[in-house]
UniProtKB/Swiss-Prot annotation:
It comes from the Bacteria. It holds the Pfam family Ribosomal_L27. GO terms for molecular function: structural constituent of ribosome. Belongs to the bacterial ribosomal protein bL27 family. One of its GO terms (cellular component) is cytosolic large ribosomal subunit. Residues 1-21 are annotated as: Disordered. Keywords: Ribonucleoprotein, Ribosomal protein. The keyword Ribonucleoprotein applies. SUPFAM superfamilies: Ribosomal L27 protein-like. Coiled coil: none annotated. This is Large ribosomal subunit protein bL27. It comes from Methylobacterium nodulans (strain LMG 21967 / CNCM I-2342 / ORS 2060). GO terms for biological process: translation.
Amino acid sequence: MAHKKAGGSSRNGRDSDGRRLGVKKFGNEAVIAGNIIVRQRGTRWHPGANVGMGRDHTLFALTAGRVQFAKKHGRAYVTVVPAQAAAE
């Protein structure tokens, strides 16, 4: 009888899912306290006024207002201009 030998198994064929990093709230976008502004690995963006940084370098709003991105001294900063100041 003719037999076909079993095929070998491949050792490839797996990959991890993307981590969904990046900017979540863009410039001049309204945020409320606790909103995530940027998810990042390391400090690509640094926290400015009214912005907190989590354990994994996630930047989040500490107050309600509008998001602003700025470069200062060769670093990129993210700040939140409070809603009262933005309205005036």
